[in-house]
Structures are given as C-alpha cells and as structure tokens.
Amino acid sequence: MKIVHVAPNAPYEEGWSYQENLLPKYQAKLGHQVILVVSTQRHHQSEQGCCSFEDYRSDDGYRVIRQPIRLFPLPFLRRTLQHLEVYDLLCREKPDVIFHHGLISPSVRQAVRYKKRINPDCVILQDNHMDYNIGFTVDCLKGRILKLIYRQLYRSTDRYINKVYGVTPWRKDYARDIFGVPEEKLDILIMGADDDQLDFANRDRYRTELRQKHGIRDDEFLIVTGGKIDQKKKIHLLMDAVKELEGVKLLICGTATEDFLEEYQSHLNPNVIDAGWIPSQQLYGYFFASDLAFFPGQHSVLWEQACASKLPCVFGKWEGMDHVNNGGNARFLDCSAPEQLRDMILQLRFTPEYQQMLAAARSDKTDIYLYSRIAEKSLECAVRK
C-alpha cells in the first residue's frame, strides 16, 4: 500500500524517537511505500527555526516532504487553524491510506476532498495526543471557543474518517468528549520504542558498563527515571524518597526546566545520580542497567519506552493510563508523598513481588510496546477493508 502521513503541528527531525518518525519507519519495514509530509519548522539544540522546501528519502526508508505551514487568514485564528496544503500532493501520489496526525488542523479536509473526488476507497486515519493535562479545557471562554471550532472541524469530516486513535486510553476519551468523535470510531494506538534500539542480546553488558561508569554496585537496587523534569513530573519527591535508603540508587536521565532547576538541585543527595540529558538512542542502555523504572508524576513517552525495554515499572496513577500495565509488569501509586514512594521501593527491592513483575516484564506481553507491533495495528482497518 501507499501511505501518506500528514503532520502539520509539530517540528520534525531525523533520528528523533517520536511517533512521526517511528510509525512511518516501521510501516516502511512492512513493505509499504510511505511518505511523511511535515512543515518546514525545525528544532535544533532547543532552538526552533524554519528551513526551505525539502523532498528526500530518510535513512529509515520513507520519503519526507517539507512544506511551509499555512496560517488561517483571520488574525485570532492564525495559529489555531494552521495547516499544510496537501491536496495536489495527494492527487499526484494517490495514497491508499492517509494518516493525519492530530485533530486540530484543517489539512484533514484536503484528505477528505481527495477521498471524495479521487479515491473513494482511501482509508483516512487520525490520532489524538491531547488530554486534559496537555490540551485545552472548557472551564474558560477560550477553551469553550476552541471546543466549538474543533468539534465543527471534526463534524465536517466525520463521514469520511475510518478510525481515530488515542495514543493513551485517556486521550481516546478526550477525543470523544472534546472533539465529539463517536465511540465506535475510536481505538487506542499506544506509543512505544524503536525495536532497532533495543539491544536485548547485550543487556548484561550495558548493565555492567553503565553501573561501573556511574559508580553503582551490581548488588544495589537501581531505579531509573527522567525526561523533561518539572514540578508535574514529581521526580523531586522520588529524590527525597531514596535519600535515606541503603543499597538503593536513583539514576535520573533528563534535565530540569529553567523555572524548576533551582528546586530540582535542592533535592540532590548522595543516593541520586544526575546523568543529564541522554540521547534517545542511548537511553535504552540505561533502562537495561536498571532494576526498576519509576515515574511518580505526569505522563512521558519514557513510560512506554521503559515498558518496551522489559523493565518493571512504577507509575503515578492517572485515570485512563492503565495501558502501561500489560500482564503485571507495572504497579501504580495513588499518592506521591516521599513516604509512600519509599514504601513502594522497599516493597519491591529484590522481593518475590518484584520477581513476579520482572517475569511479566520479560515476557512477550510487553512486545505490544514495540513499534513493529504498533505499525501493524495502525493499519488493521486498512487491511480488513
């Protein structure tokens, strides 16, 4: 099949581990012709900018086309309804499947126009990455206006959309409640990890080398956490939880946001190793070196990547986020106070309960977090059709 991805709302870079990179990569590995259409927006060393039009083949086997973003003509909606002009491209490429990333860009109407005029058998898929934490809420006037605008946008295309995926159960519910997507059109397409980066055959080597690098004994219980660190991630509370624990170390892979840096540094202690920002290609080695992943706060894509690394995990409990527990690989915590975090660590530190979690994590149940499996699921309705 020929598949065109349209991703108007996020910067794209080669080598990143985001869905826009990995879903096309693994669909291409399945033998499909894949094109990714993104904006000319770039992101280098934490600085955003723009490039010129580009059309090239990525190292991962799919074609990338960069186009300038188009802003809506009314000033107060310029960014709200930004889009890419893709209709002519779709007519030229004649895709069998269009995967439109997000529910907030009018670009999807051009996909619908292509389906109506050129290829009635084309399958149109959308996904949603927004929720009540990182989306908009309806408790203010702006939020209510956005809800009306985006609901109308979806309503105008619903008849021609085959499936809408939430990347978590909560985000599936958000698509239903905020955008008005019918329940029967909704499904979950989780995020995960790049199979090619998971070097399970050398897991023991990573464990030995990285522990030696950071001065961690093999018999110490190593907890890993990280990401973009801010108040909502609650990693500072986990730092307090390990402060007085013997034989326990906390390895943090990530950097604190500028407004949280001073607070973060005040919680550093001898049981905490601050590894700084780790490139995504190297992050899996740190998961292999660890005994437990622990994320007490807001969701991060590292959650699913830790699950894919077959590492037992503890997560802060969020409604609609139970997809990261598949067969017993994870535990959830209602409370993030340091005392409760400490109790959970002691409950799991090389205990029989931990061994059960480890067995579940190492089983094939956690293969669902691999992008090779996610890519297959993303095309199920196209194959059935």
Feature locations, PLM:
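Carbohydrate-associated surface elements
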Residues: 170, 192
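A charged, aromatic-enriched C-terminal amphipathic alpha-helix characteristic of glycosyltransferases
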Residues: 352-382
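Nucleotide-activated donor-binding/catalytic signature segment of Leloir-type glycosyltransferases, i.e.
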Residues: 261-282
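Glycosyltransferase donor-sugar binding loop
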Residues: 193, 226-230, 249-262
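Membrane-proximal helix-turn-helix segments that form the acceptor-binding/catalytic region
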Residues: 113, 117, 132, 144-164
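Acidic donor-binding loop of glycosyltransferase active sites
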Residues: 288-298, 311-312
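Conserved donor-binding/catalytic core segment of Leloir-type glycosyltransferases
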Residues: 4, 165, 217-233, 239-242
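N-terminal subdomain of nucleotide-sugar transferases
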Residues: 1-52, 56, 60-62, 240-243, ...
